[in-house]
Amino acid sequence: HTATTRTSTAAPAPSDATVTTRHTLRTASGELPYTATTGRIVLREEVYDDGVFQGTRAKAEVFLTAYTADDADPTTRPVAFVFNGGPGSASLWLHLGLLGPRRVLAGDAGEPAAPPYALVDNAESLLAHTDLVFIDPMSTGYTRAAEGQKPGDYHGYAGDISAIGELIRLWTSRQSRWLSPKFVIGESYGTLRGAALAEHLQGPLGMYLNGLVLISSVLDLSSIDFENQRNDRAHALYLPFYAATAHRHGKHPGRSRDDVLAEAQEYADRDYPWVLSRGSRLTAAERADAVATLARLTGLSEEYVDRADLRIEHWRYFGELLRAERRTVGRLDSRFTGPAASAIAEEMDADPSFDAI
């Protein structure tokens, strides 16, 4: 008889996999030697069967990139944990676009970068002041659920915060940084995540932050909700942005941007919310005055503002401001403009600022 040997096809248990390199950043205050560590950190959970501990199993593999200054005192050198928003965005935008020691040479409005694209030293990197740990939330970048786990468990508010909090705890413990000043930096939805993380870290994990940095803050999602017709806050809050955008594109000749913004902010703070709350109770004169004011500030026609019932939805604004020139305005950065595919589209059909990134 011939014996047969069965070979297990089960995948090996995941383990941390990181790569470390060393570099030097040239800043305004001199050269800064630093260490870069990137890769996946495995998050694990305890397993019990009928109350009996069975060990641990992997639940997620979280991707991070950490930059730490060499020869720094960890009790005084801060560390900042950084992520973008979405939800659903990796951290590469803040990493390679703003805070990291290297950044994409991206050009600017009217001067887009041409291929071949390049990375350059970022002399204004926050690494000159704090160590940086860039984190990709679940299903973004290279972060994935472990085999047999459901990524959806981490896509919600609570699961997202729990996973990132656990990653921060692990990194802090393994790098002996509990005594370091600690900060969280979030962008857009990441500001809401950051605020929730501060409570989560302080509560279950016993880690106290020294500060939060909120970029493009949106702690109250109703402040950007244009779809709820009973919510007028977004219309008032966006008015100064519309006014600044209109000024950028020549709709306020002879006026300074600060002057235009001051008027828009004053109107958005006081008269505009009152006007919107009055609805059909506005007199003809009050409505006409509001239409004229909004048209002047936003750069739109009085006819459009009146048809919009004094409420200017942001996607429509980007498509309407330069409609006569058959161009759209950027949403992420309203200095950018691009050709409109349609001259009759209800709202912008593409974001020229996003396309330029």
Q: How would you name each of these model-derived features?
A:
Residues T2-R6, Y48-D153:
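N-terminal cap/lid subdomain of alpha/beta-hydrolase-fold enzymes
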Residues E46-Y48, L105-R177, S223-I224, D232-A236, ...:
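Active-site-proximal cap/loop segments of hydrolase catalytic domains
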Residues R102-L105, A198, Q202-L300:
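A catalytic-pocket lid/entrance helix-loop region that shapes and gates access to the active site
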Residues G190-A195:
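Catalytic nucleophile loop
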